[in-house]
């Protein structure tokens, strides 16, 4: 009997250790400046303090921020690598990107429309040239690899949320004169005969998995896109543009999250997205913008489980 009691007490004592072993980790990327001045000026960097406030309130202890000049493609990839290396089973991970988006030629031939959707790091050029073929664009193919690597580390009990306050298309007319749009209407066209962009993209993915020590290549560039084994919140539908708030000059999706999380504790994902869309609609004057939620994990855990204590 005494042995059973001791065993039971030991089990109880072990529970807090297991609970505390779960770590909340975040990577926050915000861009309001670009090395290539052909990109229109936006305020993605101003989103970062709002996101930091959300994460602090939600109890995130490990937060990496990359703002403007620090958010190069190499810097972002390195942050993903460090995040993956640090993650453990059951961790909660939040990835936030505020910046430009652009479509470019799908060099891996795995997209139905022939276009990759890209995040735009600090050192990415807006147009292809004799010396630039999309090497610094961060494609959805690469992002899927990095995010799936994190998912594999945190396991089935882990939670992964990705927020993208950008869009992958734009409108040259920009609607109202003072509208600031995150995204551009032109596609970066890569010459299929020029393999430079493909090579660097492939090498980045390869080194992420196997390093530079010549181990067997585990990446198949012709494979279908990896599954979206997380929840993604995007600022708008693919056929819409993402227009910033006028006051304050920040991302509309980021500001909606910051505002609504102050007013709500824990609700289901459908209800939470309903509130986010309602906020965006209230603050949209020129063109419709509807935030979207996608991913295989939509019914597995709640967004507010991640972004609140």
Positions of predicted regions on the chain:
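Bacterial N-terminal signal peptides
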Residues: 7-16
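Cysteine endopeptidase catalytic domains of the caspase/legumain-like
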Residues: 21-309
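Bacterial N-terminal signal peptides that target proteins for export
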Residues: 1-7
């Amino acid at each position: 009997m005494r042995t059973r009691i001791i065993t039971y007490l030991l089990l109880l004592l072990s529970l807090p250790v297991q609970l505390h072993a779960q770590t909340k980790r975040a990577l926050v990327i915000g861009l309001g400046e670009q090395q290539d001045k052909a990109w229109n000026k936006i305020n993605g960097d101003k989103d970062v303090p709002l996101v930091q406030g959300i994460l602090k309130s939600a109890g995130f202890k490990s937060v990496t921020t990359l703002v403007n000049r620090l958010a190069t493609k190499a810097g972002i990839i390195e942050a993903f690598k460090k995040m993956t290396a640090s993650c453990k089973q059951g961790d909660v991970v939040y990835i936030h990107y505020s910046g430009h988006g652009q479509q470019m030629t799908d060099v891996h031939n795995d997209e139905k429309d022939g276009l990759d959707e890209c995040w735009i790091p600090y050192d990415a050029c807006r147009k292809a040239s004799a010396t630039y073929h999309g090497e610094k664009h961060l494609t959805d193919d690469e992002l899927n690899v990095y995010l799936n690597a994190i998912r594999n580390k945190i396991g089935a009990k882990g939670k992964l949320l990705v927020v993208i306050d950008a869009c992958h298309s734009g409108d040259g007319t920009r609607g109202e004169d003072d509208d600031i749009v995150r995204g551009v209407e032109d596609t970066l066209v890569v010459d299929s005969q020029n393999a430079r962009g493909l090579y660097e993209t492939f090498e980045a993915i390869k080194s992420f998995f196997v390093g530079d020590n010549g181990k067997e290549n585990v990446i198949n560039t012709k494979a279908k896109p990896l599954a979206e084994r997380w929840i993604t919140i995007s600022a708008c539908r693919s056929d819409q543009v993402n227009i910033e708030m006028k006051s304050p000059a920040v991302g509309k999706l980021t500001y909606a999250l910051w505002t609504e999380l102050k007013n709500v504790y824990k609700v289901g994902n459908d209800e939470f997205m309903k509130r986010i869309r309602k906020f965006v609609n209230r603050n949209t004057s020129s063109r419709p913008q509807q935030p979207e939620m996608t991913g295989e994990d939509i019914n597995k855990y709640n967004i507010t489980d991640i972004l609140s204590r």
